[in-house]
Each structure stands twice: as C-alpha cells, then as structure tokens.
C-alpha cells in the first residue's frame, strides 16, 4: 500500500517553476474573462473591442469605456458618481439609482465624444422595461461589452443599474434582463414597476419611511445628510428625474480648478550662489580686519 509521497522541491523544480500573472496573484483580474472581452477577430484590423467597465468603492462608482492595446488599456471616456452633485444629486452616491445615473452620464458623454448624441438619444423616459437601441440608417450605435471584473453578478446588483443607465443612454451592450432588479425567477420575466422604483430611488424612500416610523432616533442619524439637504421620501422620484434631465442637457466633464500651492515657511537656510558666498567671505574678512585694526589702536593707547 503506497503512502503519502512528499513533493521534493529540488533545484530543477525551482528552475522550471512559472509564476502566475501579477494581477492574478493579487486576486485583481479574472484573466479567463478578460481574454474573452479583449480578443478580437483576426480579420478585423485596428478595430478594438470596447468594454463598459463598472467598479465600486465605499464612496464612489466608476464607469469607463476602455479598449485594450499591447501597450496597455486605454480609457476613452469615464464617469464617476462624485460628479453627480453637479447635476443635483448630492447624497446617496453609491446606491442602485446613483449607479443608473453614472451609467447614463457615461453613455451620453461617449456618444457626444463620437458625435452620435443627436442620432442616438436612447430611452429618454426610464420606465424600467428592457431597452435595445435601434440602428440608424447612417451610423451604427456604439457597441461595448459589460466588464464586471470580480463582482458577484447576483440579480439586482448595482452593476446592472449602471448597465441599465448606459442602455437608456443609447449604448449598444449585449445583455439579458434576468439580472435587473425586479426580475422574478418563478415567472421568468422582469417586473418593470419594481425596476422603475429602484431606478428612481424608491427602495431608499421605502426604507426612509419604515425607519422614520420604527426607529426615529436611528433615522435622524442614518439619513442625516438627506435631512440636511431637505430631501424626503416623497420628493425622491422628482429629484432623480431632474438629475436625468440635467445629465442629458450637459454630459461633458467639467474641468477642475486647482488652487495655487501655498507658500510654506522655510526652516532651512536657502542655498547661496557662488557670487553670494564670495561677497559674504569678503564682508567677513573686512569685519575681521577692521576689528584687528581697532585692537591695535587700543594697545598703542595703553602703552602711551
């Protein structure tokens, strides 16, 4: 009966050992998915595959249109949820409704960049129903592939809120409605009313109402920023409608104005030039000579 045989990590083993890619070792990139999102047909020359990349942090949502080159990925356009205060949404910048706004902003921005914003206006009124952009006579719609990275693609995930925003904005992204918020697995169809509620922040409004009734003190702390801005549960839908209209009116990225750096107090001596050092030396020598001459005069007076 054979027992456990320990692997002998010899010199030959270490010489032939091949490490995985760095971002695989760090657990940041799914290369199985990436190779399928970036590999293009060999008969399509200089035609990149565009990816609609969505990533989330604790306080921000990032949406980008990216394409791969040998030198590295190139970001063609980007939109962030921290831009939404410019359009009237100052709180709740990481929820499903904010993800929709970020996707919509990116779609309108990239279409304006390509000169397609007038031809493909998308779905102006968000109804919650699935939407596919129809090709126009002259130019085809801008096509991209959804890149979710390592996000778990559960039904109702915020990444699909960003996808819905990009679709309504006029981008052509292959998709299914099975992962949108409101899809019912038993009935195998999307409940557009539930999805519409999520797009306009209705789920947040419901939570505000229930918490205000059950735990008023916690409500004051949890929704303090909403209350400071004067946002209540009843005005949530109207707020998001204004934000969507403002995004469509001007999707361009605003240039940030940076302040001039403040002048800091110097605690170390400034380095002198050669001429300054030479002049300083002459001054010190003159001072020494004058002091030496004064001492000689004092000695002569004492002798007298």
Swiss-Prot record:
One example GO MF annotation: structural constituent of ribosome
GO biological process, one term: ribosomal large subunit assembly
Keyword Transmembrane helix recorded: no
UniProt entry keywords in alphabetical sequence: Cytoplasm, Nucleus, Ribonucleoprotein, Ribosomal protein, RNA-binding, rRNA-binding
GO cellular component terms given for this protein: cytosolic large ribosomal subunit; nucleus
Ranges for region Disordered: 285-304
CDD domains associated with the record: Ribosomal_L18_L5e
Matches recorded under Gene3D superfamilies: 3.30.420.100
Biased composition (Acidic residues): 294-304
Keyword Cytoplasm: yes
Compartment(s) where it occurs, according to its Swiss-Prot or TrEMBL record: Cytoplasm; Nucleus
Self-association and partners: Component of the large ribosomal subunit (LSU).
Family membership: Belongs to the universal ribosomal protein uL18 family.
Task of the protein: Component of the ribosome, a large ribonucleoprotein complex responsible for the synthesis of proteins in the cell. The small ribosomal subunit (SSU) binds messenger RNAs (mRNAs) and translates the encoded message by selecting cognate aminoacyl-transfer RNA (tRNA) molecules. The large subunit (LSU) contains the ribosomal catalytic site termed the peptidyl transferase center (PTC), which catalyzes the formation of peptide bonds, thereby polymerizing the amino acids delivered by tRNAs into a polypeptide chain.
Name of the protein in its database record: Large ribosomal subunit protein uL18z
Species assigned in the record: Oryza sativa subsp. japonica (Rice)
Gene: RPL5A
């Amino acid at each position: 009966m054979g027992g456990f045989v320990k692997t002998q990590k010899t010199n030959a083993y270490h010489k032939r050992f091949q490490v995985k890619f760095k971002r695989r070792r760090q657990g940041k990139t799914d290369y199985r998915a990436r190779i399928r999102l970036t590999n293009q047909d060999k008969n399509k020359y200089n035609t990149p595959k565009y990816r609609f990349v969505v990533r989330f942090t604790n306080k921000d949502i990032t949406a980008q249109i990216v394409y791969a080159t040998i030198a590295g990925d190139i970001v063609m356009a980007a939109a962030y949820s921290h831009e939404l205060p410019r359009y009237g949404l100052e709180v709740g910048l990481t929820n499903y409704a904010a993800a929709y706004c970020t996707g919509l902003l990116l779609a309108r921005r990239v279409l304006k960049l390509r000169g397609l914003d007038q031809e493909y206006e998308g779905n102006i009124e968000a109804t919650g129903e699935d939407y596919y952009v129809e090709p126009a006579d002259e130019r085809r719609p801008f096509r991209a592939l959804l890149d979710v990275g390592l996000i778990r693609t559960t039904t109702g995930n915020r990444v699909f809120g960003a996808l819905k925003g990009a679709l309504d904005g006029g981008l052509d992204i292959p998709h299914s409605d099975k992962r949108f918020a409101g899809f019912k697995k038993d009935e195998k169809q999307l409940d557009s009313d539930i999805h519409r509620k999520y797009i306009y922040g209705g789920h947040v409004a419901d939570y505000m109402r229930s918490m205000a009734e059950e735990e008023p003190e916690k409500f004051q702390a949890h929704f303090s920023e909403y209350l400071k801005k004067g946002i209540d549960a009843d005005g949530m839908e109207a707020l998001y409608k204004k934000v969507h209209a403002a995004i469509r009116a001007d999707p361009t990225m605003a240039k940030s104005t940076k302040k001039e750096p403040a002048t800091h107090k110097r605690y170390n001596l400034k380095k002198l030039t050669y001429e300054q050092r030479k002049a300083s030396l002459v001054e010190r020598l003159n001072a020494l000579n004058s002091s030496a001459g004064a001492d000689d005069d004092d000695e002569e007076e004492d002798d007298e």
